[in-house]
Regions:
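Conserved nucleotide-sugar donor-binding catalytic segment
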Residues: 137-191
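Conserved donor NDP-sugar-binding/catalytic core segment of glycosyltransferases
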Residues: 97, 101-132
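Glycine-rich, basic loop-to-helix element that forms the pyrophosphate-binding segment
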Residues: 66-84
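A conserved acidic beta->alpha catalytic loop
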Residues: 30, 38-48, 93-96
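N-proximal low-complexity "stem/linker" segments adjacent to membrane-targeting elements
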Residues: 1-26
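Short aromatic/hydrophobic "clamp" motif used to bind/position activated sugar donors
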Residues: 89
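Cell-envelope/extracellular polymer assembly enzymes that use nucleotide-activated donors
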Residues: 2-5, 33, 174
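Short beta-strand/loop segment that forms part of the nucleotide-sugar
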Residues: 32-40, 64-68
Length: 191
């Protein structure tokens, strides 16, 4: 069974953070640790994050909150990655949420496939209640439409040598392409 480290990068996220955090803390397969990496929010984001510390600990999750200036989302992600001790690292944006059994399904896939990188389908929800499923695909020649960043889980050893670049808004896609080129084992969870 794998230990999970989950990272949420925030900046002025007081309106969306609660749902994201609750979706992590209430997993049927709890993560080992959960990091909130905040870019120096001016609203109540940090207070909201800290208010979940006791609940997280009750569920066996070590919650850490770091708030300081960063150089954008990928810099913040790299900070979080450097703090992680779990076998598998997941990133969930402050305006996204996991289904209750997400980590259980990822762990089952890891036990079966021993992936380096896993990603899955993504339910896109609109404020008016409409939603659709963006299917994930694993092809030899990937496009940015084949994978869904909020559903991506990566073995910590892979991230150690492959940080996000912090130069453009497409640095997540750059990372996926670099990992593909290096021969990382990709797996898709279509659920």
């Amino acid at each position: 069974m794998a230990d999970f480290s989950i990272i949420t990068v925030t900046y002025n996220s007081e309106n969306t953070l609660k749902r994201a955090m609750e979706s992590v803390i209430n997993q049927t397969y709890a993560p080992k640790e959960y990091f909130i990496i905040d870019g120096g929010s001016k609203d109540n984001t940090v207070d909201i994050a800290l208010s979940y510390k006791a609940i997280a600990e009750k569920n066996g999750i070590m919650l850490s909150v770091l708030s300081e200036h960063d150089n954008g989302i990928y810099d913040a992600m790299n900070k979080g990655i450097s703090m992680c001790g779990g076998d598998i690292i997941g990133m969930i944006n402050s305006d996204d949420y996991y289904e209750t059994d997400a980590l259980k399904l990822v762990n089952e896939s890891y036990e079966k496939d021993h992936f380096d990188v896993l990603y899955g389908d993504l339910r896109m929800c609109y404020e008016d209640g409409r939603s659709f499923i963006k299917k994930a695909r694993n092809r030899k020649y990937m496009t940015s439409r084949d994978w869904n960043h909020p559903t991506m889980f990566v073995r910590r050893e892979i991230y150690k040598d492959n940080k996000y670049k912090t130069e453009t808004i497409h640095d997540d896609y750059d990372l996926v392409l670099r990992l593909k080129k290096q021969g990382a084992k990709f797996s898709v969870l279509n659920k």
